Curated annotation (Swiss-Prot):
One of its GO terms (cellular component) is cytoplasm. Keywords: ATP-binding, Cytoplasm, Kinase, Magnesium, Metal-binding, Nucleotide biosynthesis, Nucleotide-binding, Transferase. Pfam families: Pribosyl_synth, Pribosyltran_N. This is Ribose-phosphate pyrophosphokinase. One of its GO terms (molecular function) is ribose phosphate diphosphokinase activity. PANTHER family: RIBOSE-PHOSPHATE DIPHOSPHOKINASE FAMILY MEMBER (PTHR10210), RIBOSE-PHOSPHATE PYROPHOSPHOKINASE 1, CHLOROPLASTIC (PTHR10210:SF41). The lineage of its organism: Bacteria, Bacillati, Bacillota, Bacilli, Bacillales. The active site is at K196. InterPro entries: PRib_PP_synth_CS, Pribosyltran_N, PRibTrfase_dom, PRTase-like, Rib-P_diPkinase, Rib-P_diPkinase_bac. It comes from Bacillus caldolyticus. SMART domains: Pribosyltran_N. Its cofactor is Mg(2+).
Amino acid sequence: MSDCQHQLKLFALNSNMKLAKEIAEVMGIELGKCSVSRFSDGEIQINIEESIRGDDVFVIQSTSVPVNEHLMELLIMIDALKRASARTINIVMPYYGYARQDRKARSRNPITAKLVANLLETAGASRVITLDLHAPQIQGFFDIPIDHLMGVPILADYFKSKQLEDIVVVSPDHGGVTRARKLADRLKAPIAIIDKRRPKPNVAEVMNIVGQVAGKTAILIDDIIDTAGTITLAANALAESGAKEVYACCTHPVLSGPAIERIQSSKIKELVVTNSIALPEEKKIDKIVKLSVRPLIAEAITRVYEMKSVSVLFD
């Protein structure tokens, strides 16, 4: 790829092998050889099957479902790479699990997003490349470099290609206004906000819509769609308020529990997601459009390896 003294080695674990292969193809390299197996009691064993001594190693692993299995795989892989004398160990986490536990929501709660950062560093990670953290301040939980990529440009390009008219970009809550504004700026559209109250986890109640949506094509945007309660209630509220069409988009399609059923029965015309998380076959429904983050991540890896600026990818 370049005349760099140290070789680039790209490895993938089990969370999103398809995306990893796509990234390797874009970069024109082969994935490194490693095996992940289980002992009879369920313990994870990893064997790196080629020399990585003195190399700059990149490991692709989202900590998606099953979150704890994938996190443990990653930590063990980092330790194996460190003991095999990798020069640098760069972790590519398209989806950073536990990111929603970024603060103490109530007394005696843990801050698990910080704990995960500590675990990655202690295991031996040199750098983290991630995509659309739930809370940008999680970058401050690390004492190693972290490159925080954005999915909005990919989503914006898709909606531009559809040539939709009278667009309004809608944030499903107050916390997502900055994200909605970034998409709105790219689409040259106004924004609206759903004012909601959440009585308990994974249960959201839509209260009010701030902004003009009647007669417009509404595009809801969030970073994560989990059980889809928030996004489907918001979509239905927008339709009831006169929106002529409702689209939704997110970077990370967790889609757990009743999410697929809720999306199918909602007013959402199309849900646009990225492949930061691998979707199983049973979740691939006609309403869901999947976009690939492979060029973005491949470019980030290349720039880090070649010691070039990554900041151009943040815009």
